[in-house]
């Protein structure tokens, strides 16, 4: 994925965040798909770890179930954060905002393929609001 440089929004905009902070948050959101896969694999790993722990152990003490449960909590927390912030940005446009920020989709794609029910200006207002809310919650 190439980084598309867009014109910076004015510092007077109510949802202004620094350009570098925006890119940090954008790349944070693009990991959503990986987190979903890792979260799902933790379920299988916990079941596997529970079976392994019943076997005679080696000299290395560890709690595999706790390890996978902590990973699951880590990924689950991030998944819920992005979903909650997308819902806060606009509960009606939530599914479109979520897909856009986690898959890097443009408004043009959302309009032509997914028939987003709003105009470009409204969408980008909610898109900026999403990143502003995410920035506030991650401080």
Annotate each language-model stretch with its function:
Residues 1-88, 108:
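N-terminal interaction/assembly modules
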Residues 73-76, 101-103, 123:
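Short acidic alpha-helix initiation/capping motifs at coil-to-helix transition points
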Residues 40-43, 90-93, 134, 138:
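Long, hydrophobic, amphipathic alpha-helical segments used as structural scaffolds
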């Amino acid at each position: 994925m190439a980084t598309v440089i867009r014109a910076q929004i004015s510092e007077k905009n109510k949802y202004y965040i620094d350009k570098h902070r925006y890119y940090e948050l954008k790349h944070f959101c693009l990991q959503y798909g990986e987190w979903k896969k890792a979260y799902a694999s933790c379920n299988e790993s916990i079941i596997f770890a529970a079976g392994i722990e019943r076997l005679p152990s080696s000299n290395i003490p560890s709690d595999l179930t706790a390890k996978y449960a902590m990973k699951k909590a880590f990924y689950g927390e991030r998944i819920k954060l992005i979903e909650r912030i997308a819902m806060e940005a606009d509960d009606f446009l939530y599914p479109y905002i979520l897909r856009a920020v986690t898959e890097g989709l443009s408004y043009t794609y959302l309009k032509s393929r997914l028939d987003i029910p709003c105009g470009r200006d409204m969408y980008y207002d909610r898109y900026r609001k999403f990143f502003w809310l995410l920035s506030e919650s991650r401080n």
